[in-house]
């Protein structure tokens, strides 16, 4: 994750936003695939998940929140793992927990929630391909195992299934709003980077 990079509000971050969130006086950020954000000031962070996984982290007493959007289960054997840790579920969890630890926040003081991991193939291919490649299921499995390794049990989960999700994460309160996507709405393409929004 990079040092404080200020993200700008864009149309993707507010599209499909629940009405009760429109009036909040917060920065609106869009989290792309392979990115992670740690926000020391409250922000409303939106992302769209298919088979990808997001984990939200919230520290209630400091109102610090973090989230990542990972597309692959493990960094093991990945040539770009050091450059793009938030692309991989296991490395993203370790990276965000490391960022909290550098601020004196222990893993067991965080409220953690797990999202995503859908199997979004078309119905005709689902049965034939699920046993071969279920990246979403594997992403969820690795997320749970990695969190467990740090002694963390997710407070809530909205995972698996056959539809993508749009998430809105309030980093100051830890609240997450989820909207299931219609099967015709693909996740949005994006760059593979990590960012750290600390100020």
Curated annotation (Swiss-Prot):
GO biological process, one term: chemotaxis
Keywords, comma-separated and alphabetical: Chemotaxis, Hydrolase
Catalytic activity: L-glutaminyl-[protein] + H2O = L-glutamyl-[protein] + NH4(+)
GO molecular function, one term: protein-glutamine glutaminase activity
Principal EC category: hydrolase
Pfam annotation, one family: CheD
Superkingdom of origin: Bacteria
Entry EC no(s): 3.5.1.44
InterPro entries: CheD-like_sf (IPR038592), Chemorcpt_Glu_NH3ase_CheD (IPR005659), Cytotoxic_necrot_fac-like_cat (IPR011324)
Job description of the protein: Probably deamidates glutamine residues to glutamate on methyl-accepting chemotaxis receptors (MCPs), playing an important role in chemotaxis.
PANTHER family: CHEMORECEPTOR GLUTAMINE DEAMIDASE CHED-RELATED
Record-stated family: Belongs to the CheD family.
Protein name: Probable chemoreceptor glutamine deamidase CheD
Organism encoding this protein: Nitratidesulfovibrio vulgaris (strain ATCC 29579 / DSM 644 / CCUG 34227 / NCIMB 8303 / VKM B-1760 / Hildenborough) (Desulfovibrio vulgaris)
